[in-house]
Amino acid sequence: MSKYSDAKELAGLTLGKKTEYANQYDASLLQPVPRSLNRDDLELGDSLPFLGHDIWTLYELSWLNSKGLPQVAVGEVYIPATSANLIESKSFKLYLNSYNQTRFATWEEVTERLTQDLSACAGEAVLVEVNPVNHYTNQPIVTMEGECIDDQDIEITSYDFNAALLEGAAGDEQVEEILHSHLLKSNCLITNQPDWGSVEIRYQGAKLDREKLLRYLVSFREHNEFHEQCVERIFTDLMKYCQPTKLTVFARYTRRGGLDINPYRSTEQDKPAHNNRMARQ
């Protein structure tokens, strides 16, 4: 369990509790989670060591137009890593469901309402795109860049999170490379439900021992944290134990409740070059 799973800030969340589904617009359904909960544990101060965003894809976004005809769209939301709060995912789902039987005059009105509400919950301006389904007709299914480190003939007997598995992972050779793994799995901080993801690590610096890196990533398998928190933990652990001069950690998680979350943290830029989905998304 996480060190802060019993924090008072989490006590009022609807996550893990039986809830009613509203179908009329209700911004009060959104619930923030202070980023400081895990950042204090990681000993991160006000000056963050990374840039980044949490990129959400909204696959179940629907409302009624002014004549009552249902509209459907796919939303993309970019929440800055500098925001005071992340947005709890079940509350996000319930909030989106509240649009289902609500009339809006234009698509622009929906975008503006989403932007206003999500920014208020996050505590910082959020970027929202609302796109018609055919916007994605020719979008490719992609994989992560670089080399996959998963095909290693190693034995693993422990699945308890252990950052010290990265000790000695930095070699003597200086490289610039991209590695990825599809074996990232952690558990929801509140419900203990599994969260499945892939993670891409782009870095410049001492060459990483791929066996040590894979063992470290697998150690998240029984770890309880939200997606965004896991990615920040990976970033800070790599910085601590391996000290690269450049580092980007980008995870893409499978969707739940019509939402997927793709946290991006980097020393170089605040967003990835694209937001194309992967096979498991």
Swiss-Prot record:
Protein name according to UniProt = NADPH-dependent 7-cyano-7-deazaguanine reductase
Pathway field of the UniProt record reads: tRNA modification; tRNA-queuosine biosynthesis
The cellular component terms of Gene Ontology attached to this UniProt record, alphabetical and capped at eight, are: cytoplasm
Cellular localization per UniProt: Cytoplasm
One annotated GO molecular function is: preQ1 synthase activity
| Positions of substrate binding | I87, E88, S89, H227, E228
Q: Which UniProt keywords apply?
A: Cytoplasm, NADP, Oxidoreductase, Queuosine biosynthesis
Enzyme's top EC category: oxidoreductase
**Gene3D superfamilies attached to this UniProt entry:** 3.30.1130.10
Biological role: Catalyzes the NADPH-dependent reduction of 7-cyano-7-deazaguanine (preQ0) to 7-aminomethyl-7-deazaguanine (preQ1).
Q: Which reaction does it catalyse?
A: 7-aminomethyl-7-carbaguanine + 2 NADP(+) = 7-cyano-7-deazaguanine + 2 NADPH + 3 H(+)
SUBUNIT field: Homodimer.
SUPFAM superfamilies attached to this UniProt entry: Tetrahydrobiopterin biosynthesis enzymes-like
| Family according to the record | Belongs to the GTP cyclohydrolase I family. QueF type 2 subfamily.
Please name the source species: Vibrio campbellii (strain ATCC BAA-1116)
Residues at the catalytic site: C188, D195
Which GO BP annotation is one of this protein's? tRNA modification
Q: EC annotation?
A: 1.7.1.13
The record's annotation in Pfam families points to: QueF, QueF_N
Query: Quick one: where's region Disordered?
Result: 261-281
InterPro entries in UniProt: GTP-CH-I_C/QueF, NADPH_dep_7-cyano-7-deazaG_red, QueF, QueF_N, QueF_type2
- Which positions does UniProt annotate for NADPH binding? S89, K90, R256, G257
Domain of life of the organism encoding this protein: Bacteria
